[in-house]
Curated annotation (Swiss-Prot):
Originating organism: Rhodopirellula baltica (strain DSM 10527 / NCIMB 13988 / SH1)
One of the protein's GO biological processes: 'de novo' UMP biosynthetic process
Function statement: Catalyzes the transfer of a ribosyl phosphate group from 5-phosphoribose 1-diphosphate to orotate, leading to the formation of orotidine monophosphate (OMP).
Protein name per its UniProtKB record: Orotate phosphoribosyltransferase
Gene3D superfamilies in the cross-refs: 3.40.50.2020
Keyword DNA repair annotated: no
PANTHER family given in the database record: OROTATE PHOSPHORIBOSYLTRANSFERASE (PTHR19278), URIDINE 5'-MONOPHOSPHATE SYNTHASE (PTHR19278:SF9)
Annotated family: Belongs to the purine/pyrimidine phosphoribosyltransferase family. PyrE subfamily.
GO molecular function annotations of the record: magnesium ion binding; orotate phosphoribosyltransferase activity
Positions contributing to orotate binding: 137, 165
Keywords, alphabetical: Glycosyltransferase, Magnesium, Pyrimidine biosynthesis, Transferase
Annotated metabolic or biological route of this protein: Pyrimidine metabolism; UMP biosynthesis via de novo pathway; UMP from orotate: step 1/2
Taxonomic placement: Bacteria, Pseudomonadati, Planctomycetota, Planctomycetia, Pirellulales
Length: 193
């Protein structure tokens, strides 16, 4: 896993996440694991300031990676519904910056009518994409998105998340040959795995 927060001032995002998204108590996570805190990132991804902060930070990571690798992804997207506001924020800011970066979404199941697609958006097989996600625990949700877009014929460059709980997600992606890039980790909030 690489945390891409080193050269970026993420203090405003971290502060907003602490006040809006971080809850303490006993919780069962999507992975089935128990935790003494919960990060409801939708409270930040759907917040006007949060959407801007996340969209800008993630777009910066995508552009920096494209500059370093020489390969610009065609699109960003992830599993509905958690990744949808993240995708929208990134592509909106990309459009404002005149960057040709589209978005897509992955349905949990293929649509039962119409074209019956699981991957929706202006993408075509063979294109390179980045999977975006809010919180990574085991990586299960993002891995389902990876599998769906690969089945559609897209090539995943890496996974980009807001926060890594440091609970095995990076290792799960590495087993699939993918790198996990994150804006923050739980340690940025004074928490340990």
């Amino acid at each position: 896993m690489s945390s891409d927060s080193a050269n970026r001032d993420l203090a405003p995002l971290i502060a907003l996440m602490e006040t809006e998204a971080l809850q303490r108590g006993e919780f069962t996570l999507a992975s089935g694991k128990k935790a003494n805190y919960y990060l409801d990132c939708r409270r930040v991804t759907l917040h006007p300031k949060g959407a801007c902060l996340i969209g800008r930070a993630m777009l910066d990571v995508v552009l920096a990676n494209a500059k370093e690798s020489g390969v610009m992804p065609a699109a960003v997207g992830g599993m509905a519904i958690g990744a949808d506001p993240i995708t929208a924020s990134i592509v909106t800011l990309a459009g404002g910056d005149d960057v040709d970066l589209k978005g897509f979404m992955v349905r949990k199941e293929p649509k039962g009518h119409g074209m019956g697609q699981q991957v929706e958006g202006p993408v075509t097989p063979g294109q390179k994409v980045v999977i975006v996600e809010d919180v990574i625990t085991s990586g299960g949700s993002a891995l389902k998105a990876v599998e769906a877009v690969q089945a559609f014929g897209l090539e995943v460059q890496y996974v980009l998340a807001i926060i890594d709980r440091l609970a095995g997600g990076a290792e799960a992606f590495a087993q699939k040959g993918l790198e996990l890039k994150t804006l923050t980790t739980i340690r940025d909030f004074g928490l340990e795995p």
